[in-house]
Amino acid sequence: MSKIKTNRSSSRLAAVQALYQYAFGEKTIDEIAREFMAGDIGREVIDEDEQAGTETFVPVMPAEPTLFAGILSSYAQNADQINEMINASFAEDWSADRVELTLKAILQAGTAELMAYPETPVAIIITEYIDIAKSFYS
């Protein structure tokens, strides 16, 4: 996984990680958010070196609490609408249920942020989540 550049980037990554964890249904969004903000989870990412076959834990910058909470709050308040929008974007014979959970969490967090922060340029938000996706899938 590539290095996270800013606290805002860390906030977005933490939101993706939180929504990924939420998908398992074991904790509420509020419980997960508290664990992230307390530093109990989400302070490191795994940097994989496929050629060497090694994994290293790399610390990330702390999340910016306002953005992190805003994304999660937006998702909690608009989950049905967000998931409907994501499902509607797939071909007729596909649904978000067929999408890997990490990708689904990236789409959910990005959509939640777009809804919560209309003043933030769309290109910035999309670029940030593309970078997050690349860090997981490249």
PLM region descriptions:
Residues 1-138:
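N-terminal interaction/assembly modules
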